[in-house]
C-alpha cells in the first residue's frame, strides 16, 4: 500500500536521533575569538543619531545682513542696499552708468577746516576743497559729474556717528543716504541705464535686501550689531556670493554630508513603474461545473526603460492586501454552475508594488531617511473571463475597474528566482470605478471592484510614472558596500520556493486520472521510490532520507503516535454512555431546526458530536499503525503526492522534506472512519458528523455512542473512502448488492477499481473530491 511511506518514516525515526547526536558532537568544538568592534559598534544601527529627518516649512527665511565682503568691483543686484563700512577717510565708493552720470563718495574725518586734498576718482587725480566743522561726526560728500571729462560738483552730504553709508539701484534710480544721524533719509538720482550701473567699493560692505530697508536705516543711524564688530567676522570675496545658474536635474546624486568613513547621499529619481496582476484559478472535481477558487497572487515583472538617455533595468512585484471574498452557487445539482470563492479588490483593499532598478540609489539601501515619493494615479480595468462548462452556454465575468492612488512608500525586500533585492514598496489605496462587474447568465450583477478572474484585461502591464527622493547613509569609499540588514536566509528562500511549489501542486490535482490513482495507491511506496524521480537525489539518497525523517519526526502525525494508546483509552473512557441517538446528517438531522426535538436533545447531540469528533481525530493514528487489506486515506494521499512529485518541475531535494511533512498533515483534512459489527456499521467524521446504519439495507439506526467507543478500541478501523452519503446515493440511483456494499464499506481496492472502470459517476466524483482535498 502507498501509505507504507508514512509507516516507514515513523518506524525509522530513531535514525534521526543518531544523526542529530553525531552532528551535536561535531559542533561542540569552540574557539575563542576577540573582536574589536571599533567606535561604530551599535548593533543594527547606523553610526549617527537619527532625528526625525527634514521637515518641510513653507516659510522663506532671508538673512537681514549678508556680509561682510571685501572691496571689489561688481554689478550690484537691483533692489539691494550696499551698506559700506569704511575704516578711514578717502574715496568710499564709485558708481557710473558710463553714459550720463558718474558718482564718487568721499569720507572726511571730524574737525577738518577748509583745505585742498587730492583724490583718485575713476582713475584720475582730482583736487577737491573739503571741510568738516563737526568735532564728532564723519562727513560723507557726494562728488558728481555728467560727462567723462567734466568737472565734479558737490552733491548731498551725510554726517554720521557710525561711519556707515548706503547705496542701492532700484526703479531706474540710484539711491543714497543723506542728512545727519540719527535722522537720515534716502535720495534717488535718475540714471539712464540704472540696471547696468557698475559699483566699485573701496571698503568692506554688506548686502541688505530692499525689503529690510528699515533695518539698513537703523544700522546707519545707530551702527552695526555688536557681533559684526568682533575679530571673528572676516570679510570674504564677493565672488563667494555668486550662484552659478544651472539646469536642475531630475535625476541626481547629491552629497548631503561626509566624514572619513560615511557620507549621506541624496538620490532623486524619475521612475516608470510597470506592473501586472497574477491570479490562480482552480476548478473543483466532478463534472466540470464547479470552480473552487479564483484568487490574486503576487506577480513579478522585469522590464527596461530610458531615463536621462540611459537604459534602466527595473523589477517590480505586485501584490494585494485586504481582498474581499465573493461566492456564487447556482444550485445543489452536480451540473449547476458554482464558484466557491472568488476574490475582488475594492475601497478597503490595498495594492503593494515593490520597485527596484539597477541605479546607484538601490546599491546601499540600509540606513535611509527623508524617503518621499510622488506618483501618478492609474486605472486598472478587468477583462472578460469565460467559464467553460461541458455543456450549455458559458457564463462570462465582465467588467470591474479600480483606480490606484498613491498612499505611501516604505522600504522592502522582494524575492526573485535568484536573488533578493532591497527595494521600495509603493502602497496604493483603491477607489472603485465604472463599469461594475457582472457574471452573465447568473444573478451576479452591478458589483463594484476589480475581480481576480482577468485583472489585467489583456494588457501586458499597467504603467505609473513618478519620482522618489531619499537620503541614504553609505560608505565614503564607493568600492565598499554595506551589509543587507534584511538579508535572505536559506529558510526564507526555501519558504518562497515552497509557496511556488504548493501552488504548482494544487494546480496539478486536475491532471491526475482516477484510475491511475487507484493503481498507484496499491503500490508499496517507500522513501526511495517516492523521491526517485527528483533530480540530484540519487547520489544523496542517504542524506535525503535522513533529512526527510528529521522533518517528519517533528510533524503532528509523528508526535501523536507516541501518545496513541493513552489518547484512545482516555477518549473511549470519557464518552457519555447514553443508549442511543439519531445520526448526524440523517433526514431528521440535528443540524436542522426540528421542532419535535427538545432543547435537551439538541444539547445531547452537540455533546455527542464533540465526543465523536474527538475520537475520530485519533482514529487515523490507530489505522496507520494496523495493517488492513482495504485502502485508506493515507494510501490515496501518498499516491497523489507521488503523482504530483513526478509531474512537478519545481520540487528539489531541499524542499522535499517539507513537502512530505506538510502532505502528511494537510492532505485530505475531512476524513471519516467506520467500524463494523456484524450487520451494523458506525461511521464518524473529523467534522463531528456521525452515522449508524444497517449494512444490508443501508437504513439508518440510532447511534450508540457507548458501543462505538468499545468498537474503536477493540476492532479494526476502516477509512470511509466511500462514505455513507455516497454509498446511499449509489444504492438509491443504481442499486448495489449486499456483497458490493460490504466491499465498499471495507474500501476494497479491486471493487473500487471496478466501479471506476465502469465509469460510475458517483464513485468517480467521490474519488475526485478526495484528490482535490490533497492540497498544501
UniProtKB/Swiss-Prot annotation:
Instruction: State the superkingdom.
Output: Viruses
Region Spike head: start-end pairs: 65-224
Disulfide bridge positions per record: 318-380
Can you cite a GO biological process for this protein?
Answer: virion attachment to host cell
Q: Which region ranges are annotated with the description Spike body and stalk (antigen domain)?
A: 248-479
Motif YGL motif in this chain: 448-450
Q: Where is this region: Spike foot?
A: 510-776
The record, for Pfam families, names: Rota_VP4_MID, VP4_haemagglut, VP4_helical
Q: Motif KID motif in this chain: where?
A: 644-646
The signal peptide here is none
Tell me which stretches of the chain form a coiled coil: 484-518
Q: Where is this site: Probable cleavage?
A: 246-247
Keyword Membrane on this protein?
yes
Question: Might you report a single GO cellular component term?
Answer: host cytoskeleton
Annotated region Hydrophobic: where? 389-409
Q: Which InterPro entries match?
A: ConA-like_dom_sf, Rota_A_VP4, Rota_VP4_MID, Rota_VP4_MID_sf, VP4_concanavalin-like, VP4_helical
List the keywords (alphabetical).
Capsid protein, Coiled coil, Disulfide bond, Hemagglutinin, Host cell membrane, Host cytoplasm, Host cytoskeleton, Host endoplasmic reticulum, Host membrane, Host-virus interaction, Membrane, Outer capsid protein, Viral attachment to host cell, Viral penetration into host cytoplasm, Viral penetration via permeabilization of host membrane, Virion, Virus entry into host cell
Q: Where is this site: Cleavage?
A: 231-232, 241-242
Query: Which SUPFAM superfamilies does its entry note?
Result: Concanavalin A-like lectins/glucanases (SSF49899), VP4 membrane interaction domain (SSF111379)
**Motif location (DGE motif)?**
308-310
Give the note: In group A rotaviruses, VP4 defines the P serotype. Some rotavirus strains are neuraminidase-sensitive and require sialic acid to attach to the cell surface. Some rotavirus strains are integrin-dependent. Some rotavirus strains depend on ganglioside for their entry into the host cell. Hsp70 also seems to be involved in the entry of some strains.
Family per similarity comment: Belongs to the rotavirus VP4 family.
**Protein name, as recorded:** Outer capsid protein VP4
Q: Which organism is it from?
A: Rotavirus A (isolate RVA/Cow/Thailand/61A/1988/G10P7[5]) (RV-A)
